[in-house]
Regions:
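Conserved NTPase motor "head" modules and their coupling/switch loops across ABC/AAA+ ATPases, GTPases
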Residues: 1-31, 173-314, 323, 327, ...
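Conserved lysine of the Walker
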Residues: 35-36
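Post-Walker A helix-loop "phosphate-sensing" segment adjacent to the P-loop in P-loop NTPases
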Residues: 45-57, 300-308
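Nucleotide-state sensing region of NTPase/ATPase domains
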Residues: 48-126, 130-132, 141-144, 148, ...
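Short regulatory helix/loop adjacent to the ATP-binding pocket of P-loop NTPases
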Residues: 139, 349-360
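Walker B catalytic acidic pair
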Residues: 318-320
Length: 366
């Protein structure tokens, strides 16, 4: 699987650029704020329909333009394919095309161009808030399981509606009459998310432990624990059981949610912990331990996606190697000898020998 070429129009700081890529390593070089990360964002968005930076689609449209266009040619699933996204500066919905045919949802292009992004912020993912860790799992699962993507979208839609009910009920108490209906549906969809996440994190933890053991020489025991609502004693239980578990938890917090006007419990609060030989990295891990564990998680994510899809996903390393010491740099580079890789950096140095070099300056290829 590899991205053969991409064309960007009015995307971020790119007015119009066409790029051909190597099926192996592509080194994207240039000073800061020239468009290197924008290019990786375009590649990631092409395959997933999700941005790792923008909160709104309009943020990706070049200033002064009405629309942005991202189009790529991919060799995947043993044939050439094309993907295209048209993003609009306003409320008009985006458009998706696969092999020239218009599609309705991002789930219809899942698996064509899966990507794994690794950026400097990910090095501290085990120290930051739970939302960042949830995004790690969600990004992978949405690409692996189109049904998960649909369930997550539905869950967030219901959660938003429930939040409005809780906020507006002070002025309109009758809204509370429909709250149980929303709680039931929220728990049904939330149970699906927990079921998917439990299996994903179980596999991710086992794979990450392998990579961590290779780097540390087995000196530390890596363990990952998925954490969801307290009434879920077995996240691998049938979805019907998980639904009831979530309903029980919501019943306990029903009055508190009404009083605070907040959705206090559910899979939108999920998290995971990583420990080394029983020591929780979130609370006690050193910078070196935390970075090595984060690297292991990203390599594990790539391995899992490759195993499930039969082809390795495209790896996007956004200025992350410069944040690592030589030992960790070598460890990462030794693990990515296969598949397509994009590496951004300001000073290419020792990396120029890895593959094709593309220099970016102010949204143009030099």
């Amino acid at each position: 699987m590899n991205l053969r070429k991409i064309e960007l129009r009015n995307f971020r700081n790119y007015e119009h650029v066409q790029l051909d890529f190597d099926p192996g390593v592509n080194l994207i070089v240039g000073d800061n704020a020239q468009g290197k990360t924008n290019l990786l964002e375009g590649i990631s968005y092409l395959g997933s329909g999700k941005s790792f930076r923008a909160m709104k689609t309009s943020e990706m449209v070049r200033f002064g333009a009405d629309f942005a266009d991202i189009e790529g040619e991919i060799f995947a699933q043993e044939r050439n394919q094309t993907l295209r996204w048209v993003l609009f500066n306003g409320s008009r919905p985006r458009q998706i095309f696969r092999n020239g045919a218009k599609k309705k949802t991002a789930g219809e292009i899942a698996g064509v161009l899966p990507t794994v992004l690794f950026c400097p912020e990910d090095l501290m993912v085990l120290k930051t808030g739970a939302a960042q860790r949830r995004r790690l799992g969600d990004h992978a699962l949405c690409q692996l399981r189109p049904n998960y993507d649909a369930a997550l979208t539905e869950y967030n839609r219901i959660l938003d509606q429930k939040s409005r009910i809780l906020k507006d009920h002070f002025e309109n108490p009758a809204l509370l009459e429909i709250l149980p209906e929303y709680n039931t549906r929220l728990c049904q969809v939330g149970a699906l998310l927990i079921s998917y996440r439990a299996r994903f994190y179980d596999s991710l933890g086992k794979s990450a432990a392998k990579f961590h053991g290779q780097f540390s020489g087995g000196a530390e025991e890596f363990a990952l624990e998925y954490k969801t609502v307290s009434t879920v004693s077995d996240p691998f239980a049938p979805v019907s059981t998980l639904t009831q578990n979530l309903l029980d938890h919501l019943d306990r917090h029903y009055r508190a949610e009404i009083e605070t006007a907040q959705c206090l419990t559910g899979p939108h609060k999920d998290d995971f912990d990583v420990s080394l030989s029983g020591i929780n990295l979130k609370s006690y891990g050193s910078q070196g331990q935390t970075r090595t564990a984060a690297i292991s998680l990203k390599l594990a994510q790539r391995e899992l996606m490759g195993r499930e899809m039969g082809e390795e996903p495209v790896l996007l390393l956004d200025d992350v190697l410069s944040e690592l010491d030589p030992g960790r740099q070598d460890f990462v580079l030794n693990q990515i000898v296969s598949g397509q890789v994009f590496i951004t950096c300001c000073e290419p140095g020792r990396f120029t020998k890895l593959g094709k070099t593309i220099e970016i300056r102010k949204g143009n290829v030099i």
